[in-house]
Design a protein with these regions (language model features):
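Bacterial N-terminal signal peptides that target proteins for export
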Residues: 1-10
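A "functional boundary" signal
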Residues: 23-214
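Bacterial N-terminal signal peptides
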Residues: 10-20
Length: 214
């Protein structure tokens, strides 16, 4: 009888330990979903799920709030909900502005706000963020961010019909990246060439468009 009792007790202990380990594994697995790395991977394909996970991450405090707002902005931008994308980008930007602990992230959000404001045709706001961002980019020695912001100024100028000024800024953005060895910056440079060509064609300046990049 004692052996039977010991066997039952050992079996119960085994079940208890097994269940605890299983629960721990599930907790780790669930928590791994509430990370910026995981959400960054899935938000384009699963935007609604990404937003739900971001809500969970905010309540669990697994991701800093400024990063949560940044990711929400990216999700909404991917869904073509530009006003919401701008709203959350600005929330992230304001948190960075107050803390001043991560100027690189502040610069990222400044670039995003300048781009989103262009999409909303809010040229005054876009120019303000772009000009502020250029100063910060120069301080951080970030040519990629600086060139993006120069190009955004050019787009604002073009949309406001200051065409020659626009092309000057396009050229400044391109010149800044010429000779780069960074793959990301080379891709950006190709994008700028393509966009400048599109603007020239739109202005019926086909000869100049053909000369772009030569």
């Amino acid at each position: 009888i004692m052996k039977s009792i010991r066997s039952v007790i050992c079996f119960c202990l085994f079940l208890f330990v097994f269940n605890q380990l299983l629960f721990a594994d599930k907790t780790i697995e669930n928590d791994s979903l509430y990370t910026s790395e995981y959400i960054s991977r899935i938000y384009m394909a699963e935007p609604e799920r990404a937003l739900s996970l971001l809500d969970g991450a905010e309540s669990k405090k697994t991701i800093p709030l400024r990063i949560i707002h940044e990711l929400r902005s990216r999700v909404y931008r991917n869904m073509y909900m530009t006003k919401l994308a701008f709203l959350y980008a600005k929330k992230s930007y304001l948190l960075d502005s107050v803390s001043q602990k991560d100027t690189k992230h502040l610069l990222t959000m400044t670039v995003d706000l300048a781009e989103l404001a262009v999409l909303m045709s809010d040229h005054k706001e876009s120019m303000r963020y772009a000009l502020d961002g250029i100063k910060l980019a120069q301080k951080e020695k970030d040519k990629g961010a600086e060139s993006k912001l120069l190009f955004r100024i050019g787009e604002n100028k073009w949309q406001l019909s200051f065409k020659e000024e626009a092309y000057d800024y396009f050229d400044k953005a391109i010149k800044l990246l010429q000779g780069t060895s960074s793959k990301l910056e080379m891709a950006m440079l190709s994008y700028f060439y393509g966009m400048k060509m599109d603007y020239l064609l739109n202005d019926s300046r086909s000869k100049e468009a053909l000369e772009v990049g030569l």
